[in-house]
């Protein structure tokens, strides 16, 4: 029984070790990742038990550093002190918000960190020696690490300053945090030197490093005031353009008002100047303006009057030849009336033919120009053809009379043309007639083809009926002709007759 129990204990212990190993591995990985986030190289020597304190310090310092402006430069010594001291949890700073006016005066953020008086006394004793060293640390981080290391070696015997390490480092970690990161090389070098030295040397170096940022925060205060003014100028810059726009608008309005006022005053002054002039001058100017207008108007009227006088005789001349065609139109109207009346009697149109064309010829010789004769001769054939088409049922005298009237009068030409156009068919009617004629022709051609085909078929039927009926041998009996031929073919192919 002892062997199984020992085996169970060993297996149980082995399982516990297996469970503890991943937990420790995860804890180490978390600390390594947090060290990488803070920008510090991992260290796996005697500083490993301090990782939890370092992580808590880094998180608390990051929370407090968010309250500080990003433009404030960070001292490298505060970065080292923040990474090395693990007993700073004992002292907690008191955050008291300041007013905006005080923050603008002191150049700090709205968080003030109160410290115990003991640490301030210890730090004030070292202030004079650390001013020059802090100025160097602001310029070169490597020089700060080397100086801090050398000073730490000198201040090894400082057991009394062990008490002031905690609050001083806490103050530096809270007040001197900004967007700038210190180089991790100095921190690593200081930690390597402390690993070879006792803890008193480590504490004294931390005191030395933590006491320096007190004045580093005071020295950037002057620079931070300038930066504060620059940062405060940002919202002022945002508000100033609005004020400047207003001022610009106001000034432009004032300028416009001033210009309008100046224009008004100028116009008023001009009016006063004109009013200050004597009245006879204004009268003379008005007279000088009136006189040329009178002269110009009279000359224009005189010039236009003869133009109108010249134009009137031309219009009279133009109206004279137009008056004569009106007379012809009246006469032609009478002639057309008589033509319609001549359909009943044949004697009256003969009398009108001899009288009215004579009058028309006399008028032509007197008034109508030569181009009218040409136009009449051009329209003779067309009008005569139209009248001949429309008046097919008239007598020879009636058909001859419109031709003489067209020879005589141009008005008669227009009247006859109008009558011919009215009697003519429209285009769509002509198209329809042509289409109907084509369709009728096609129908006739189709009928002719059908008749011819029917006659041929009938002829074939008659020929078939006239042929004699076939004999019974031809209908397919045993002695029919095709069977005989088949027998002969078989004999010729299979049996060749031999000679006798």
UniProtKB/Swiss-Prot annotation:
Extent of the signal sequence: 1-27
Transmembrane domains' residue ranges: 430-450
Record's subcellular location: Cell membrane; Cytoplasm
Keyword terms, alphabetized: Cell membrane, Cytoplasm, Glycoprotein, Membrane, Signal, Transmembrane, Transmembrane helix
Organism superkingdom: Eukaryota
Ranges in the topological domain labelled Cytoplasmic: 451-500
Glycosylation sites: 108, 148
Compositionally biased intervals (Polar residues): 76-89, 159-178, 279-289, 298-324
KW Membrane (keyword) present: yes
Record membrane topology: Single-pass type I membrane protein
Extracellular compartment segments: 28-429
Segments for region (Disordered): 55-198, 275-324
GO cellular component: cytoplasm; plasma membrane
InterPro entries membership: MUCL3
Ranges of biased composition (kind: Basic and acidic residues): 58-71, 111-123, 132-142
Primary role: May modulate NF-kappaB signaling and play a role in cell growth.
Protein known as: Mucin-like protein 3
Species the sequence originates in: Mus musculus (Mouse)
This protein's encoding gene: Mucl3
